[in-house]
Protein backbone atom coordinates (compact mmCIF):
# COMPACT_ATOMS: atom_id res chain seq x y z
CA UNK A 1 0.00 0.00 0.00
CA UNK A 2 1.54 3.28 -1.12
CA UNK A 3 1.21 6.93 -0.27
CA UNK A 4 -0.30 9.89 -2.01
CA UNK A 5 2.07 12.83 -2.40
CA UNK A 6 1.24 16.41 -3.30
CA UNK A 7 3.22 19.10 -5.04
CA UNK A 8 2.87 22.85 -4.72
CA UNK A 9 4.66 23.85 -7.93
CA UNK A 10 6.51 27.13 -8.10
CA UNK A 11 9.19 28.63 -10.30
CA UNK A 12 11.51 29.21 -7.32
CA UNK A 13 10.50 26.53 -4.81
CA UNK A 14 8.40 23.39 -4.87
CA UNK A 15 6.61 22.22 -1.75
CA UNK A 16 6.10 18.51 -1.14
CA UNK A 17 3.69 16.74 1.19
CA UNK A 18 2.98 13.05 1.74
CA UNK A 19 0.15 11.04 3.20
CA UNK A 20 0.42 8.19 5.63
CA UNK A 21 0.07 4.72 4.06
CA UNK A 22 -3.62 4.66 5.01
CA UNK A 23 -4.08 7.82 2.92
CA UNK A 24 -5.89 9.63 5.70
CA UNK A 25 -3.40 12.20 7.05
CA UNK A 26 -1.28 14.73 5.13
CA UNK A 27 2.16 15.65 6.41
CA UNK A 28 4.41 18.46 5.18
CA UNK A 29 7.51 16.80 3.79
CA UNK A 30 10.08 18.99 2.08
CA UNK A 31 10.71 22.11 0.05
CA UNK A 32 13.07 21.80 -2.90
CA UNK A 33 14.59 24.52 -5.04
CA UNK A 34 13.34 24.73 -8.61
CA UNK A 35 15.76 25.12 -11.49
CA UNK A 36 15.33 26.98 -14.76
CA UNK A 37 15.97 23.61 -16.42
CA UNK A 38 12.92 21.34 -16.32
CA UNK A 39 14.97 18.13 -16.35
CA UNK A 40 17.04 19.26 -13.37
CA UNK A 41 13.91 20.17 -11.41
CA UNK A 42 12.34 16.81 -12.29
CA UNK A 43 15.46 15.00 -11.03
CA UNK A 44 15.42 16.94 -7.76
CA UNK A 45 11.73 16.32 -7.10
CA UNK A 46 11.89 12.65 -8.13
CA UNK A 47 14.88 12.08 -5.82
CA UNK A 48 13.03 13.70 -2.91
CA UNK A 49 9.86 11.69 -3.56
CA UNK A 50 11.79 8.41 -3.64
CA UNK A 51 12.13 8.82 0.14
CA UNK A 52 8.35 8.32 0.38
CA UNK A 53 8.01 5.27 -1.89
CA UNK A 54 5.93 3.36 -2.59
CA UNK A 55 3.80 6.13 -4.09
CA UNK A 56 0.40 5.32 -5.57
CA UNK A 57 -0.51 8.80 -6.79
CA UNK A 58 0.95 12.29 -7.22
CA UNK A 59 -1.37 15.28 -6.76
CA UNK A 60 -0.14 18.46 -8.45
CA UNK A 61 -1.75 21.69 -7.35
CA UNK A 62 -3.09 23.93 -10.11
CA UNK A 63 -3.16 27.63 -9.23
CA UNK A 64 -6.07 28.48 -11.50
CA UNK A 65 -7.41 31.99 -11.87
CA UNK A 66 -10.50 32.83 -9.82
CA UNK A 67 -12.50 32.45 -13.04
CA UNK A 68 -11.38 28.81 -13.22
CA UNK A 69 -9.21 29.38 -16.29
CA UNK A 70 -5.55 28.43 -16.48
CA UNK A 71 -2.99 30.91 -15.24
CA UNK A 72 0.54 31.05 -16.68
CA UNK A 73 1.86 29.12 -13.67
CA UNK A 74 -0.90 26.49 -13.86
CA UNK A 75 0.13 25.77 -17.45
CA UNK A 76 3.71 25.23 -16.24
CA UNK A 77 2.47 23.08 -13.34
CA UNK A 78 0.56 20.87 -15.80
CA UNK A 79 3.62 20.42 -17.99
CA UNK A 80 5.72 19.61 -14.92
CA UNK A 81 3.17 17.12 -13.61
CA UNK A 82 2.90 15.35 -16.96
CA UNK A 83 6.70 15.07 -17.21
CA UNK A 84 6.95 13.83 -13.61
CA UNK A 85 4.30 11.16 -14.27
CA UNK A 86 6.43 9.81 -17.12
CA UNK A 87 9.66 10.01 -15.15
CA UNK A 88 8.31 8.26 -12.07
CA UNK A 89 5.86 5.97 -13.87
CA UNK A 90 3.22 7.09 -11.36
CA UNK A 91 -0.27 8.46 -12.06
CA UNK A 92 -0.73 12.21 -11.58
CA UNK A 93 -3.93 14.11 -10.90
CA UNK A 94 -4.25 17.87 -11.00
CA UNK A 95 -6.06 19.57 -8.14
CA UNK A 96 -7.52 23.07 -7.96
CA UNK A 97 -5.48 24.95 -5.40
CA UNK A 98 -6.94 28.42 -5.81
CA UNK A 99 -6.24 30.57 -2.74
CA UNK A 100 -4.17 27.85 -1.00
CA UNK A 101 -1.05 30.03 -0.87
CA UNK A 102 -3.11 32.95 0.44
CA UNK A 103 -4.58 30.76 3.18
CA UNK A 104 -1.11 29.57 4.18
CA UNK A 105 0.23 33.13 4.15
CA UNK A 106 -2.59 34.30 6.44
CA UNK A 107 -1.99 31.39 8.83
CA UNK A 108 1.73 32.14 8.97
CA UNK A 109 1.10 35.86 9.57
CA UNK A 110 -1.16 34.95 12.50
CA UNK A 111 1.78 33.06 13.97
CA UNK A 112 3.80 36.29 13.80
CA UNK A 113 6.51 34.83 11.57
CA UNK A 114 8.72 37.25 9.71
CA UNK A 115 8.82 37.31 5.90
CA UNK A 116 11.87 35.04 5.65
CA UNK A 117 10.32 32.44 7.98
CA UNK A 118 7.01 32.62 6.08
CA UNK A 119 8.76 32.13 2.74
CA UNK A 120 10.63 29.12 4.07
CA UNK A 121 7.47 27.40 5.34
CA UNK A 122 4.82 28.47 2.83
CA UNK A 123 5.48 26.05 -0.04
CA UNK A 124 5.54 22.88 2.04
CA UNK A 125 2.44 23.96 3.97
CA UNK A 126 0.64 24.76 0.72
CA UNK A 127 1.47 21.24 -0.49
CA UNK A 128 0.04 19.89 2.76
CA UNK A 129 -3.21 21.84 2.24
CA UNK A 130 -3.48 20.58 -1.34
CA UNK A 131 -3.04 17.02 -0.12
CA UNK A 132 -5.52 17.47 2.76
CA UNK A 133 -8.09 18.81 0.31
CA UNK A 134 -7.55 15.86 -2.02
CA UNK A 135 -7.66 13.25 0.77
CA UNK A 136 -10.86 14.77 2.17
CA UNK A 137 -12.55 14.13 -1.19
CA UNK A 138 -11.64 10.41 -1.21
Each PLM stretch: what is its role?
Residues 2-4, 12-138:
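Phosphate- and other anionic-substrate recognition elements at nucleic-acid/protein interfaces
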Residues 8:
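Conserved catalytic-loop position in the HRD/HxD motif
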